[in-house]
């Protein structure tokens, strides 16, 4: 799957030709630099390694790797397979790789919510009613196991814990608009992650 690295700018809404208000996400997609070209002869598979967003402080290894491509070290580096075009080391891949109306998959890191209970984390309904003598069980998880057999809690039991901060991928999001001169993609709907977080757009 070919694609680009982008940065989530934020959400807005636009009107379509029928006057319907559509919520959408604006993403700065590229320009990305080809930092390495993987070949079957050398690496055993074909892929393009793209870099996005210049890095300020960088180690010698990353600096040397970027210098081969004639660029500076990048904050985000991702490999993409399935590019039909013949890109060379140091070439720039822009938002024009995408077209209006096509569907893309977007992966990112979801917003971290911290330690959350089972009602927020898993959608539990809580235990019992708010009356009839019950006073502190409204958002409790309830029973997590049986009795002396199996005498343990099964793996995968839905319980309270850290929520969010995970890799999330949303598929088949429509590209509403491509603003080539500003390297912007307008995507229908929401995209995982907070503002200014990196996302991977693939098709």
Curated annotation (Swiss-Prot):
Subunit structure: Part of the 50S ribosomal subunit. Forms a cluster with proteins L14 and L19.
Superkingdom of the organism of origin: Bacteria
GO cellular component, one term: ribosome
Membership in a protein family: Belongs to the universal ribosomal protein uL3 family.
Xref: Pfam families: Ribosomal_L3
Its job: One of the primary rRNA binding proteins, it binds directly near the 3'-end of the 23S rRNA, where it nucleates assembly of the 50S subunit.
BP GO terms, sorted: translation
Gene this protein is translated from: rplC
PANTHER family: 50S RIBOSOMAL PROTEIN L3, LARGE RIBOSOMAL SUBUNIT PROTEIN UL3C
Keywords: Ribonucleoprotein, Ribosomal protein, RNA-binding, rRNA-binding
Record protein name field: Large ribosomal subunit protein uL3
One annotated GO molecular function: structural constituent of ribosome
